[in-house]
Amino acid sequence: MGAQGEVMLNLPDNGIIHLNSPRSVSETLARLESIVQAKGLTILARIDHSGDAAKAGLKMQPTQLLIFGNPKSGTPLMIASPSIAIDLPLKALVWQDENENVWLSYNNPGYLKERHAIPDNLLQNIAGIGPICAEAVS
């Protein structure tokens, strides 16, 4: 436990931001979808990894991925640095750990900036994922 009862996640710093959610995986993802749509972004896919695992006869903790974006924001990034296409569209992973804590995880825009040498003036095109995800777990 962290400060003031905050749940801590003990994972290496690998460019992924993890936010604890007070809701279930399904509820958190539904809230995230609603916020993404309200911001005018396009939802491209919702992948239910745990559901697909169950269809294959395997069991895993609830885990779902939301893929979303806006070509007007992403295309200038890909023109400036084509390798960022491997990390776009934006992705947010909502998952439950072995202690039944729910997490919303996403790539740190600053990490993506360094990884793909994104020009400073284009970082704003992906920086909005932070506030969107924070709102989803609030």
What are these regions, as identified by a protein language model?
Residues 2-39:
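Terminal, regulation- and interaction-focused segments at domain boundaries
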Residues 13-15, 62, 88, 100:
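A generic structural signal for well-ordered coil/turn residues at beta-strand boundaries
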Residues 44-94:
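Compact, glycine-rich, soluble single-domain proteins
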Residues 91-119:
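Beta-strand/loop substructures that line and gate deep hydrophobic ligand-binding cavities in soluble
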Residues 114-138:
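Well-ordered alpha/beta subsegment
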